[in-house]
A protein has these predicted regions:
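Structural preference for solvent-exposed beta-strand-turn elements
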Residues: 1-365
Length: 365
């Protein structure tokens, strides 16, 4: 293999590829990236056996070839090279890297044992979404997935498509986050996708990117521009989350999102010891009193709101509340409640594409 490529181009490819490299694998070849040079194009493939990334770019290929090179070492080298042409030459498993007056010689590995990328057929369900919608939906739901490894179906984000609506759902047992976006697809689909894969892909694309999504029985493919990501689906049945959404509503509160969020975050400043992470809300007479109490001290703050229905006293894990509020971009939010023991729904005013449901914490009188 012999090729010439701009330093900034190879760094771009490496940064993308390293998002799927297995850093602590017992299989040495998984710590490497497969380089394939042919037809004046360089393709890099990386995998941790759960997620696979393929990314490519045009360059000057003088001799076709392929080889596996250690990701960490190669990445460290090319990122330190000057912005000049990088020559990459291989002979057998020997790798030569030349840029300006810098020369490096590495040991590579033959590509024969590198895992093949998953294959999806033209008959698999396929549709397109906007990069901005994908980025926002993952941001608005990913934080609510469970970290409990004994419940793998809740470790991922549930994707559910009905006709041209794609829904992102995350549950951890204490809160539920849902984000809806439009697609150009038609049909129904259900898949539990690994959160990490979705989050890594959103770091690769731009908001103005177009993303093609394709699903098989075992994998989902996300493709944008010159980059593809394959992710193995979590093969479990998801919870019937719609039952959770069906709740009676006796009180409806409208409040400025930023003022409410800032007040919750200020109350949380006294909860940093980690022993208590509780904020209390006393809602009545178009006012929300927000208080916290810990060994460090106490806080108390009032903010205005508009309330329909009876007032209520309710308490929450402060982090659960603030994470949901940070996911909302609107100026005002609507909070729907049914007393102090049932969960509340929070969603942007005049926007039903996102809803966040969180359980309260029972406290004594």
């Amino acid at each position: 293999m012999r090729l010439k490529i701009k330093q900034e181009d190879i760094v771009k490819l490496i940064n993308i590829s390293q998002r799927a490299v297995s850093s602590k694998s017992s299989v040495q070849i998984l710590e490497g990236i497969l380089f394939i040079a042919q037809n004046n194009r360089l393709k890099l493939i990386s995998t941790d056996m759960e997620t696979t990334i393929e990314t490519s770019i045009d360059c000057m290929v003088e001799e076709d070839g392929e080889i596996v090179i250690n990701s960490s070492l190669f990445g460290d080298i090319v990122k330190k090279l000057p912005r000049d042409t990088v020559n990459i030459n291989t002979k057998g498993t020997d790798v030569e890297i030349i840029c300006g007056k810098s020369q490096f010689y590495l040991n590579g590995q033959l590509s024969d044992n590198f895992p093949l990328s998953p294959k999806l057929s033209d008959e698999d369900l396929s549709f397109n979404i906007k990069g901005e919608d994908l980025i926002n939906s993952v941001r608005r739901t990913g934080f609510a997935t469970s970290t409990d490894l004994t419940r793998p179906h809740l470790n991922g984000i549930f994707l559910e498509m009905k006709e041209n609506n794609l829904r992102f759902v995350a549950i951890d047992g204490y809160r539920l986050a849902i984000s809806d976006i439009e697609t150009d697809g038609k049909g129904n689909m259900e898949a539990i996708v690994q959160k990490k894969a979705l989050e890594e892909f959103t770091k690769i694309i731009n908001e103005d990117s177009d993303v093609q999504v394709k699903k098989s029985e075992s994998h989902i493919l996300l493709e944008s521009g010159d980059t593809k990501m394959f992710s193995r689906l979590i093969d479990k049945k998801y919870l019937d989350y719609e039952i959770i959404l069906k709740m009676d509503v006796t009180s409806e509160i409208v409040v400025n999102k930023i003022k409410f969020q800032n007040a919750i975050e200020r109350a949380s400043l006294l909860l940093r010891d980690g022993k208590v992470n509780l904020v209390k809300l006393a809602i009545k007479d178009d006012n929300i009193n927000i208080s916290s109490n810990s060994e460090i001290g106490t806080s108390n703050e009032d903010i205005a709101c508009k309330i329909k229905g009876p007032g209520l006293n309710i308490a929450f894990n402060a982090r659960y509340l603030t994470e949901g509020l940070r996911a909302i971009d609107s100026e005002e939010i609507v909070i729907k409640a049914n007393g102090s023991l049932d969960p509340i729904k929070i969603y942007p005013k005049d926007d039903e594409s996102y809803v966040y449901l969180v359980l309260p914490v029972r406290v004594g009188n």
